Amino acid sequence: HPITESAEMPYPGPASLEERGVGSLDDLSLSEQNYPPQRGAGLRYATLEVLLEKQSLLNPFSRVFGIRKQFAGTTECFWKYCV
């Protein structure tokens, strides 16, 4: 049986190393999934705001929505348009 144990030992060894490697890759992917997507989400929101601003330049109705988003309660005026 010590022969089978010695024969079995090398196989679990590399397998455990592979599992550790995969685990480290999973940890990296998890950390990437946790942190950069939040930054990406922030960038997405920023691009959404920029797109809304561009649409507000083209569409007066979206200007009204942008005003209510930005100045919710203080003033409802944006450039020459007041609500």
UniProtKB/Swiss-Prot annotation:
This is Urotensin-2. One of its GO terms (molecular function) is hormone activity. GO terms for cellular component: extracellular region. Disulfide bonds join C77-C82. Its main location: secreted. It comes from the Eukaryota. Keywords: Cleavage on pair of basic residues, Disulfide bond, Hormone, Secreted. Belongs to the urotensin-2 family. InterPro entries: Urotensin_II. Urotensin is found in the teleost caudal neurosecretory system. It has a suggested role in osmoregulation and as a corticotropin-releasing factor. The non-hormonal portion of this precursor may be a urotensin binding protein, urophysin. One of its GO terms (biological process) is regulation of blood pressure. Residues 49-71 form a propeptide. It is found in: Secreted.
